[in-house]
């Protein structure tokens, strides 16, 4: 049964869509500041307000 095996092993012509998180521009505005790393981790919330 070549037909059955062929369907199982189909050439992947469709582009593989990698699930990437949407760019958080509004939610993570502080991420653009100097303390982007700490702000993104929600460790220093004051950093966002100061800068």
Swiss-Prot record:
It is found in: Cell membrane. Its main location: membrane. It comes from the Eukaryota. Palmitoylated near the C-terminus. Residues 1-28 are annotated as: Disordered. One of its GO terms (cellular component) is plasma membrane. It is a lipid-anchor. Signal peptide: none annotated. Keywords: Cell membrane, Lipoprotein, Membrane. Present with 861 molecules/cell in log phase SD medium. Belongs to the CYSTM1 family. This is Lipid-anchored plasma membrane protein CPP3. It comes from Saccharomyces cerevisiae (strain ATCC 204508 / S288c) (Baker's yeast).
């Amino acid at each position: 049964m070549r037909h059955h095996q062929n369907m199982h092993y189909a050439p992947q012509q469709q582009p593989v869509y990698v699930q990437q998180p949407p760019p958080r521009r509004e939610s993570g505005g502080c991420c653009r500041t100097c303390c982007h790393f700490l702000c993104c981790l929600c460790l220093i919330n004051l950093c966002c307000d100061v800068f």
